[in-house]
């Protein structure tokens, strides 16, 4: 469990938190603890010849939990024969055989791999219509009651604060019923369905009252996207506008979350307001930045009284005066700024983020999709090339499912016309167009369509690299197998994926590596791609070249690094920002509305420029030089 930088009085016991919270560094660690509690309960019940009644959730959060339970069944011989399950919810309408159904989800991730009795499995029926739905809901409540009630209810949480599909406005006494889904919930489901118009707008869900009757409740949440709603639920007032806050009234509830999901809790965000903290350089920087933002003052204008009035007297005691704190933090921030991301050759690098030598460096820039590098660090990428380094662009996945069918059709028209003008056969292009015309709105895309979409995105990446001066022989398309399913649902990361990255690393032997640390979605492609790189590092970490390799994590497509975390800030001039924009433009299939925009409807170049300008503005308001924009990076230290 994470306890660094603060000394908690107990498991989440502080004046801000109204629900017990257990924080783990990673979801992997957290699910092991939850799985052990479930298994202990199952086995205790079995020893008394009793049934164990579990309420189960779907969605991203419980996937790793179910994987751990399956592992315990296979490797430790844990039996689930005495388990009765009731699932929280199901979309309406939803055929059971659909990959998007929770019936399919539960069997795919859990039930097909353990020894549970099929007659003990209960999942809401998404095929029902009209009065059948109400009758089913009444019978579902009766079935839970007949089973003796739920012993342990597992929950996730939606960004609206929904538990199950109990959206804002749900009553604490509500029972199993048909509901209409919130707009944000529908947006979050697009990644599972492929497009908004395929996401159902209704569902069957257990009620808040049904959940509250469970004897024990564990809510799990992973990733930064969940941080705001976790804070609102744990520290906010009870309100039907955030249904999860009703859990504050449950006598036996536990939130189990990872460090990212906990990042906005007061004990993580402002730990000095909770208890005595262990001040390190990053936490001191964070406290001073927050104070500057609150008071709208630059660092060097903060006074003793400002620290004393805002719970930061410890810093005065530690340093002796506000002036000494200010100078230390100002210098700390100033030293993150570098116009030489690859290191300035033959210069004193004692206060620079990157070492001067060797020069030039071999640089690997990993990009989860074929445009993430230019979106997130295009200015830095161009500068590395300009300053003479051997820059390699590495595209981990094809990104093929993010190409609209209409756009590919247009490209096939162009290719067909070229073929006609050159007097060669364009029959293949005509066949692709015919395939596109006959595509069904759901399901995996045909391989021939995916092949051309892959080629299209590769050509766009080559064009962007060519524009920035990266030769084609230094552009690497890995097409990692985990991604190549032809649908939004991906395979699990495997050894084949890791080996591909290991082989490239050992071939190039880079002095510098850049990788996407944009983990807004902890089970999205960015996270999986970073996990693949980290697992590859585990393999090569004893290689001589790796011991002298710096690893930098970038963001920018979805979120930006907070100022207190930044290790290197690269200024971007107006002309360099224009170069970055032009490189992004080369990815034509992603312009005029990306396939998976998330919450932000703007083009990627607009998002990136705003984030880069906001970062420069932060530095300027803290008292640093004024730049047009900045791209920022966090250094990753493997094994530390």
Residue ranges and their predicted role:
Residues 65-76, 374-398, 402:
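Histidine-anchored nucleotide/phosphate-binding helix
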Residues 186-194, 198-203, 296, 301-364, ...:
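Metal-dependent de-N-acetylase/amidase catalytic core
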Residues 59, 365-374:
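Short, glycine-rich nucleotide/cofactor-binding loops
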Residues 13-139, 143-146, 391:
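N-terminal active-site beta-alpha-beta segment that forms phosphate/nucleotide-binding
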Residues 53, 84, 151-152, 216, ...:
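Structural motif
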Residues 65-72, 164-175, 523-539:
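Short Gly/Thr/Asp-enriched flexible loops that form oxyanion-binding sites at enzyme active sites
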Residues 2, 6-8, 25, 29-30, ...:
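Conserved phosphate- and dinucleotide-binding cores of soluble alpha/beta proteins
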Residues 45-50, 145-149, 503-511, 516:
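Glycine-rich phosphate-binding loop signature in dinucleotide/nucleotide-binding domains
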